[in-house]
Each structure stands twice: as C-alpha cells, then as structure tokens.
C-alpha cells in the first residue's frame, strides 16, 4: 500500500481496518502529525493498535 494522507474519519476508519479486534488508542496529536500532515503507511498505523 502506498503511503497516503489520512485525516479525520478516514484516519479512524483506517485504524479500525488495520487494528481490527485489537482496538487502538487514539492519540490525535501524534497520529495526525504522522498521517494527515504527512502521508503515512500501514506500519505507522499499526503502532497505534493496542
């Protein structure tokens, strides 16, 4: 998957998709910086899974 900009509900949807049953902790400051302001990939999202 190519890195992409994910903001707002798109970011939350992507976290649900990547983390599934594990769930995730939503740290807007960190993840918005990494995935909305700059493009990020799935590995970055996985860091936010529980």
From Swiss-Prot:
Record-level GO cellular component terms: extracellular space
InterPro entries: Insulin, Insulin-like, Insulin-like_sf, Insulin_CS, Insulin_family
Primary location: secreted
Disulfide bonds: 7-36, 19-49, 35-40
Gene3D superfamilies: Insulin-like (1.10.100.10)
Keywords (A to Z) from UniProt: Carbohydrate metabolism, Disulfide bond, Glucose metabolism, Hormone, Secreted
Biological role stated in the UniProt entry: Insulin decreases blood glucose concentration. It increases cell permeability to monosaccharides, amino acids and fatty acids. It accelerates glycolysis, the pentose phosphate cycle, and glycogen synthesis in liver.
Similarity field: Belongs to the insulin family.
Protein name in the entry: Insulin
Gene source species: Myoxocephalus scorpius
Lineage start: Eukaryota, Metazoa, Chordata, Craniata, Vertebrata
């Amino acid at each position: 998957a190519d890195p992409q900009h994910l903001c707002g509900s798109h970011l939350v949807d992507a976290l649900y998709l990547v983390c599934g049953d594990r769930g995730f902790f939503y740290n807007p400051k960190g993840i918005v910086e990494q995935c909305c302001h700059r493009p990020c990939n799935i590995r970055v999202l996985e860091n936010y899974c529980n």
